[in-house]
């Protein structure tokens, strides 16, 4: 048997350890270069294992499967391993339990070749018994640290933050580019060895000056990319081209090439500026396929460069030789299911469904869009225009089996309308989107130099719904131990049950995930995916059983979920799901009753959104002529057929048809609604009516459009609120004239308040917009508008019902048809400095309004907020008026039901929760469920308890006032409850002074029994200060509430006269009376705990001495790595020396877990320490 010279696996382990510690890019590359200069093993094997993310082998073992194998070998509890896995990385779990197992070699003897052979054997071993044998054999040769590294290779993540670029740049500056193009690691390594590590720029820098390794996959700076586009080449100079050519690695048949990819843009403008001439290709909603043909042999690869499953391609394989006579070729395309009756692609996911059920009228079809290799020659350096010609000359269309992608040639910005029309057609036909390609561009493997534009990329066109988060799942990797994925559901009114829609995690950053954990802990209970523990009110499939489930649906969080589209799904119990879901925000203003229902979800899914036609588009039609180089007739006939089909669909959808044939007669503009006479205004009228929506309560709304009006013209809300005339009956109007010196004397603005908002009958309900009252108010307003010969300006209301088309119909019928001009204000598509009115479709977004302070400066205009649907609503207009956080976000209140009526208790609970706060049943001073406010209106035991602990105690009217004013009010004496008369801790003095609550000094006195103290006052604990900082709603200021409690110790002979009220000696309970306690620094919330100990009769020791009775630390009972005595070792040793010097007895007390203190407090009794002893 020949000697294994592949190299030591332990040496690779040491290299990984160094790379994990090194943070700089150049440092990592230098470490690799230094290591490989002395490495005598197989460099290709080393590269193969180090670049495990590039290894396309399928090992058939996931994290929990590996734990199951290991638990079987080590005879340990699988549940314990899974529980440990919940805390993070499964590779760490494997290492930890391997160490506990104890039977492992002391020294690593594995070689790289042996590890590679083990990995190869795992790719062909699908049975559990075979996998156990392979892993068991491996474990006999490797240490726990070796095994962790093997597991990381299997998991394709070495956790060293070192990609292919870092590794290959250590050898040659062109090595990574060659690898990207050919995806042939062995060929690259052989080339490196031929160059004998000659490296002119092997510092690991990608040459773009941005310290980014894999940001775009091409290593170009922004300026380089611009050069690349202008030149039509790769963006390199002639010298670098020469270098690249000298290092070029040939494309190899049957070795997949990294696909060229598109990057996202969010506007049509961003596309048309990308090139003077580009191909706009239909983006088919299937799976990427790369076909390699070598004679009669075929291989098909996925986007991830892995072989496609045979069942996906077997149907279409026989048609490949029928479509071409070429012997060798590499084709790029998309595989999907085609409806043979309509010749229309079927939605994403149907290909998998076809495997199980089969579709009678559907076939598997490949849409080809590129050719990379032909008869021994690479074509990737040719421009796209030439490659497309070669593709169409060498491949013939086989109907519904082999097709070409549909292409529209667009000549830059001059043909923007053609692109807009094509997009509208794509979205209406529910295709995925478009891919934009520069006609003169090369094929650059792994680079994102194409552009993709999809519905969910265009601002506001994505589908969204407010769903209920009823379950949570643990994250993985660095997010292990945190709940990062949520099970989203909606309510099925017909069947009276909650049904699943989607699992969502995207959209949350690390900070938001951390913020959500306390909410998860307090409102959810752990069920560890046990189906039997799913509540009766939730219809949840077994495979979606979560790690956590909400305790009470009323406490569930509401998330706004945005997605590319709604799709039908057999996996979720609603029958629907969402593609590419992401969490936009938490809806603190909604609860389980006001979240999207299943019926509403179905309606949202029917919605077809249209891209606004921009200025100069001349109302282009929604169809377009498409051409390719040689298949113009085929493409055009297909387009006509698709247009006929879309027309047929319109017959079934009256509203959609009407919208297409009869566009809105109203004028959609992008001007500032509150500045209608600006220079850019398209309105020539000298008198303007601005419509404002109000209710019949007589109270001016300080939010939304009303709030913006009040800020700019304060006289309007003031006039509105004067006398009894401020109450406007539903369906009626009231007109207020604007007084503004900045408006020319010959021009006038009127605010027309329409009473069409119906206020809620209770706090549980919400405001609604009445179409009936809106019609009535508009009819009444028409007379006033005609009398003044004015035009009308308005914003779309903030309500999703009624629909805008219904309001459009009323405005058109009553105003436009009566000769009144109507302007609907929307978001500008251009920059603030060049904003101009644009005529758009009715689905254009809503108005932009500047704040009063910035109205004169276009550059200071507020940017529009993100829309959740296709229409931006009124409440999204002003960012200052609609802050993102609820005003009671940091409030967790306890309501004293003994001092407040039950009716008021319910009202307070609803108010607090509506404003984003929480309500708890009992007072909790610290921890996740820490309470912040006690709400009471009289003397009670609960009041005394919280008062003695220095808690914040408020009257119910504070909550009511905050709710009414919609802002967090500062706590002053009108809101703070403090009962001095009946308080048992206070004694009356003959000459007590009347002091305000802020000025009053509260003194807690105790009587000393030690005669040696004489008349000297001893201050035991001087000041305990608790400062509660409550963020105000707009985050611009904070309210600080300081509670100072001075605790002094005075002897019986104190002759001082105190005219203020003084507290008597008073303890809640004397449960710690005999205890002198030392708190270690690691104890959580030490200051609060000190206060509790003192309040409950105990004493605090600042150092360990012979009088100390208890030493307290925060450690779990089942600690393993830290010995509790070690925590106090230095303290005890120092104390022992002092005691020996003083000839004192050495009694250091008992070391106990801090839980002993908390449990004793909660049980109101001194518990036995034996269950809490740590030493």
Swiss-Prot record:
Biased segments, Low complexity type: 622-635, 829-859, 987-996
InterPro entries for this protein: ATP-dep_DNA_ligase (IPR050191), BRCT_dom (IPR001357), BRCT_dom_sf (IPR036420), DNA_ligase_ATP-dep (IPR000977), DNA_ligase_ATP-dep_C (IPR012309), DNA_ligase_ATP-dep_cent (IPR012310), DNA_ligase_ATP-dep_CS (IPR016059), DNA_ligase_ATP-dep_N (IPR012308)
Residues involved in Mg(2+) 2 binding: 432
Cofactor(s) needed by this chain: Mg(2+)
Highest rank taxon of the organism: Eukaryota
EC numbers: 6.5.1.1
Record's compositionally biased regions (Basic and acidic residues): 1019-1036
Annotated localization: Nucleus
Catalytic activity: ATP + (deoxyribonucleotide)n-3'-hydroxyl + 5'-phospho-(deoxyribonucleotide)m = (deoxyribonucleotide)n+m + AMP + diphosphate
GO molecular function, one term: DNA binding
Active site annotation, chain numbering: 283 (n6-amp-lysine intermediate)
Record field: compositional bias (Acidic residues): 199-221
Keyword Repeat: yes
NCBIfam families to which the protein is assigned, alphabetical: dnl1
Name listed for the protein in its UniProt record: DNA ligase 3
Species annotation: Dictyostelium discoideum
């Amino acid at each position: 048997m020949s000697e294994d010279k592949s190299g030591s696996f332990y040496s690779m382990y040491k290299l990984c350890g160094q790379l994990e510690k090194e943070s700089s890019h150049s440092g990592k590359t230098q470490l690799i270069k230094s290591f490989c200069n002395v490495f005598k093993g197989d460099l290709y094997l080393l590269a193969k294992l180090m670049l495990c993310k590039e290894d396309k082998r399928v090992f058939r073992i996931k994290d929990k499967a590996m734990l199951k194998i290991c638990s079987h070998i080590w005879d340990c509890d699988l549940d314990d391993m899974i529980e440990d896995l919940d805390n993070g990385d499964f590779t760490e779990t494997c290492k930890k339990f391997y160490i506990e197992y104890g039977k492992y070699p002391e020294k690593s003897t594995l070689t790289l070749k042996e590890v590679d052979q083990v990995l190869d054997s795992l790719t062909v071993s699908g049975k559990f018994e075979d996998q156990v044998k392979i892993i068991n054999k491996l474990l006999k040769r490797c240490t726990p640290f070796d095994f962790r590294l093997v597991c990381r290779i299997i998991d394709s993540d070495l956790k060293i933050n070192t990609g292919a670029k870092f590794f290959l740049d250590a050898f040659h500056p062109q090595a990574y580019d060659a690898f990207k193009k050919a995806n042939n690691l062995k060929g690259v390594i052989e080339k490196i060895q031929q160059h004998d590590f000659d490296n002119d720029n092997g510092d690991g820098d990608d040459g773009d000056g941005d310290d980014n390794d894999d940001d775009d996959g091409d290593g170009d700076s922004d300026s380089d990319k611009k050069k690349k586009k202008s030149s039509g080449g790769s963006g390199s100079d002639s010298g670098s081209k020469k270098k690249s050519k000298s290092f070029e690695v040939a494309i190899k048949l049957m070795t997949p090439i990294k696909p060229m990819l598109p990057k996202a843009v969010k506007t049509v403008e961003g596309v048309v500026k990308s090139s003077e001439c580009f191909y706009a290709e239909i983006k088919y909603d299937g799976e990427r396929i790369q076909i390699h043909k070598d004679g009669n042999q075929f291989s098909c690869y996925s986007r991830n460069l892995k072989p496609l499953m045979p069942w996906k391609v077997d149907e279409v394989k026989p048609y490949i030789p029928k479509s071409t006579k070429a012997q060798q070729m590499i084709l790029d395309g998309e595989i999907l299911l085609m409806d043979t009756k309509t010749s229309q692609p079927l939605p994403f996911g149907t290909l998998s469904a076809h495997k199980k059920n089969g579709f009678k009228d559907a076939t598997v079809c490949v849409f080809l869009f590129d050719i990379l290799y032909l008869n021994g020659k690479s074509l990737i350096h040719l421009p796209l225009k030439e490659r497309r010609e070669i593709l169409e000359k060498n491949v013939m269309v086989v109907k519904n089996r082999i097709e070409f992608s549909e292409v529209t040639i667009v000549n830059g910005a001059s043909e923007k309308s053609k692109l807009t029309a094509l997009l509208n057609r794509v979205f209406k036909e529910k295709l995925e989107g478009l891919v934009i390609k520069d006609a003169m561009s090369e094929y650059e493997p792994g680079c994102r130099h194409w552009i993709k534009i999809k519905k969910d990329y265009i601002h506001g066109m994505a589908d969204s719904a407010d769903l209920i988060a009823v379950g949570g799942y643990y994250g993985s990797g660095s997010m292990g131990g945190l709940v990062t994925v949520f099970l989203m559901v909606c309510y099925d009114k017909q069947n009276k049950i909650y049904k699943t829609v989607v699992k969502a995690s995207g959209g949350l950053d690390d900070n938001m995930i951390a913020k959500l954990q306390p909410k998860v802990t307090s409102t959810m209970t752990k069920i560890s995916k046990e189906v039997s523990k799913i509540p009766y009110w939730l219809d949840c499939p077994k495979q979606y059983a979560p790690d956590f489930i909400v305790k009470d649906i009323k406490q569930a969080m509401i998330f706004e979920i945005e997605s590319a589209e709604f799709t039908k799904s057999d996996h979720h119990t609603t029958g629907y799901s969402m593609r590419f879901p992401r969490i936009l925000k938490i809806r603190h203003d909604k609860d389980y009753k006001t979240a999207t229902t299943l019926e509403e979800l179905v309606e949202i899914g029917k919605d077809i959104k249209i891209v606004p036609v921009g200025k100069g588009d001349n109302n282009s039609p929604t169809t377009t002529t498409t051409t390719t180089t040689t298949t113009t007739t085929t493409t055009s006939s297909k387009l006509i057929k698709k247009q006929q089909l879309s027309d047929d669909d319109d017959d079934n959808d009256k509203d959609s048809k009407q919208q297409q044939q009869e566009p809105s007669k109203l004028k959609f503009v992008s001007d500032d609604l509150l500045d209608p006479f600006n220079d850019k205004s398209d309105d020539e009228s000298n008198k303007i009516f601005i419509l404002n929506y109000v209710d019949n309560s007589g109270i001016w709304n300080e939010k939304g459009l009303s709030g913006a009006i009040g800020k700019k013209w304060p006289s309007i809300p003031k006039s509105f609120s004067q006398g009894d005339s401020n109450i406007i009956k539903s369906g009626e109007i009231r007109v207020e004239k604007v007084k503004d010196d900045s408006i020319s004397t010959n021009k006038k603005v009127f605010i027309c308040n329409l009473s069409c908002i119906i206020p809620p009958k209770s706090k549980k309900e919400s405001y609604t917009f009445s179409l009936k009252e809106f019609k009535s108010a508009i009819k009444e307003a028409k007379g006033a508008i005609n009398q003044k010969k004015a035009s009308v300006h308005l914003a779309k209301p903030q309500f999703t019902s009624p629909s805008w088309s219904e309001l459009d119909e009323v405005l058109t019928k009553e105003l436009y048809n009566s000769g009144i001009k109507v302007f609907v204000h929307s978001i500008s598509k251009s920059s603030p400095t060049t904003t101009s009115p644009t005529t758009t479709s009715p689905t254009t977004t809503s108005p932009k309004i500047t704040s009063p302070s910035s109205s004169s400066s276009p550059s200071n205009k507020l940017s529009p907020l993100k829309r959740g649907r296709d229409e931006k609503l009124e409440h999204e207009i002003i960012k200052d008026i609609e802050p993102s956080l609820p005003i009671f976000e940091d409030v967790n209140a306890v309501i004293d039901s003994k001092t407040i009526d039950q009716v008021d208790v319910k009202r307070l609970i609803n108010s607090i929760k509506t404003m984003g706060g929480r309500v708890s049943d009992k007072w909790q001073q610290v921890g996740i469920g820490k309470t912040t406010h006690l709400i009471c209106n009289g003397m009670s035991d609960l009041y005394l308890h919280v008062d003695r602990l220095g808690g914040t105690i408020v009257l119910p009217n504070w909550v009511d006032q905050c709710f009414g004013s919609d802002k967090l009010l500062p706590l002053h004496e009108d809101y703070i409850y403090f009962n001095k008369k009946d308080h048992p801790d206070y004694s009356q003095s003959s000459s007590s002074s009347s002091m305000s609550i802020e000025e009053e000094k509260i003194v807690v006195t105790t009587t000393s029994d030690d005669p040696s103290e004489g008349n000297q006052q001893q201050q035991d604990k001087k000041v305990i200060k608790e400062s509660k900082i409550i963020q105000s709603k707009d985050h611009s200021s904070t309210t600080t509430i300081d509670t100072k409690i001075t605790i002094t110790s005075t002897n019986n002979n104190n002759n001082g006269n105190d005219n203020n009220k003084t507290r008597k000696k008073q303890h809640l309970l004397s449960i710690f009376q005999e205890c002198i306690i030392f708190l270690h620094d690691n104890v959580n919330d030490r200051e609060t705990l000190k206060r509790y100990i003192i309040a409950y009769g105990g004493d605090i020791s600042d150092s360990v001495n012979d009088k100390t009775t208890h030493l307290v630390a925060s450690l779990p009972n089942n600690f393993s790595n830290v010995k509790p005595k070690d925590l106090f070792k230095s303290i005890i040793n120092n104390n022992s020396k002092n005691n020996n010097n003083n000839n004192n007895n050495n009694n250091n007390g008992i070391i106990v877990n801090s839980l002993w203190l908390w449990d004793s407090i909660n049980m109101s009794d001194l518990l036995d320490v034996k269950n809490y002893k740590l030493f």
